[in-house]
């Protein structure tokens, strides 16, 4: 539809004035601006990368990862840090819980020598540090662990029985209002790890669970990932890890509500080899005959754990099968449901 000439002149004049005050590009016609592809950082999980629709978590956005205790929230975040560092990214970890296991992070592939770490005393200090490093323009990824541990200074300085209703929620709301635009401008990804609480007096319909820190994070987050432990993995009667399910409950850059399941092995983190086998079997790329698993003419092993061990040693073969899985799923990256259980028994 053609725009009136007088209106065109008025708009052009306004754009020139805005550019003069706020800088060139402060207001543009969408048709004149090239739509940029959304870059992403891999999560370290093949299934979750596909579920997110763009190959990982989006750059320049706020991400929330939440779930019950020991569900894999910090493990997933450390894998994202490792993947970002592999591509030359600079990462920071704001450890509000004062519980970062450096040795575990190193085993997951994190370059701990170059990881920036802060253990702040208060929520205000944590968020000030977050804002400062983000505005520097030199950081690619920041992880805050966790929202629940961002305790306001007034609460720390007060007596044990004092009530501080809504203090943390107001702190988060204020910080997110300040930081969102800067994150986009600097192309910095911010991940908040969050915990689950039960709603007091919840009756009737709806989930009785909620996350800490108020509602602001729910609105500002471009992606929200709910991660849960769904089973224990056993080998020779020994617990060797957990099976986790991650659900993308909010996604502003691709269709939401997709799910992914993966193994989290004790001391090793997310098992990429386990996902390769699961997706390979589902898509008929990996053949399963009884307990034996094979790819083309090559036997991978008898049983899932043996096949995982072989793929862990043969990276080239693992990469080849991964590529075939991605090609089979297609350019739309429609996530295909996995079997309800992995290929060996769990409890």
Curated annotation (Swiss-Prot):
SMART domains: AAA (SM00382). It holds the Pfam family RecA. It comes from the Bacteria. The protein migrates as a 40 kDa protein in strains 69A and NCTC 11637. When overexpressed in E.coli a 38 kDa protein is made which is unable to complement the E.coli deletion mutant. It has been suggested this size difference is due to a post-translational modification. GO terms for cellular component: cytoplasm. GO terms for biological process: DNA recombination; DNA repair; SOS response. GO terms for molecular function: ATP binding; ATP hydrolysis activity; ATP-dependent DNA damage sensor activity; damaged DNA binding; single-stranded DNA binding. Keywords: ATP-binding, Cytoplasm, DNA damage, DNA recombination, DNA repair, DNA-binding, Nucleotide-binding, SOS response. InterPro entries: AAA+_ATPase, DNA_recomb/repair_RecA, DNA_recomb/repair_RecA_CS, P-loop_NTPase, RecA-like_C, RecA-like_N, RecA_ATP-bd, RecA_C_sf. Its main location: cytoplasm. ATP binds at residues 67-74. It is found in: Cytoplasm. Belongs to the RecA family. Can catalyze the hydrolysis of ATP in the presence of single-stranded DNA, the ATP-dependent uptake of single-stranded DNA by duplex DNA, and the ATP-dependent hybridization of homologous single-stranded DNAs. It interacts with LexA causing its activation and leading to its autocatalytic cleavage. This is Protein RecA.
């Amino acid at each position: 539809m053609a725009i009136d000439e007088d209106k065109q002149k008025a708009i052009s004049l306004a754009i020139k004035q805005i550019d003069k005050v706020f800088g060139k590009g402060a207001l543009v016609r969408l048709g004149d601006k090239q739509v940029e592809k959304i870059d992403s950082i891999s999560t370290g999980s093949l299934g979750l990368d596909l579920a997110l629709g763009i190959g990982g978590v989006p750059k320049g956005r706020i991400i929330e990862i939440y779930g019950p205790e020991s569900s894999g929230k910090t493990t997933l975040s450390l894998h994202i840090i490792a993947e970002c560092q592999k591509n030359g990214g600079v990462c920071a970890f704001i450890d509000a819980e004062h519980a970062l296991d450096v040795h575990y992070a190193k085993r997951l592939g994190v370059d701990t020598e170059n990881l920036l770490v802060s253990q702040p005393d208060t929520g205000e200090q944590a968020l000030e540090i977050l804002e400062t490093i983000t505005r520097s323009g030199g950081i690619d990824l920041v992880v805050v662990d966790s929202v629940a541990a961002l305790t306001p200074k007034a609460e720390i300085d007060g007596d044990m029985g004092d009530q501080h209703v809504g203090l943390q929620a107001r702190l988060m709301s204020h910080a997110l209002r300040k930081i969102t635009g800067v994150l986009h401008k600097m192309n910095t990804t911010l991940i908040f790890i969050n915990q689950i609480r039960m709603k007091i007096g919840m009756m009737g319909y709806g989930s009785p669970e909620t996350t800490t820190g108020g509602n602001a994070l729910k609105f500002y987050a471009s992606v929200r990932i709910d991660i849960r432990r769904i089973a224990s993995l056993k080998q020779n009667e020994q617990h060797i890890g957990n099976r986790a399910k991650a659900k993308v409950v909010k996604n502003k850059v691709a269709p939401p509500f997709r799910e992914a399941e993966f193994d989290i092995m004790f001391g090793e983190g997310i098992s990429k080899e386990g996902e390769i086998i699961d997706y390979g079997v589902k898509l008929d790329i990996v053949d399963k005959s009884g307990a034996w698993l094979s790819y083309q003419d090559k036997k991978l092993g008898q049983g899932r754990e043996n096949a995982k061990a072989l793929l862990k040693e043969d990276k080239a073969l693992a990469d080849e099968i991964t590529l075939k899985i991605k090609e089979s799923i297609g350019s739309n990256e429609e996530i295909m449901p996995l079997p309800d259980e992995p290929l060996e028994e769990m409890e």
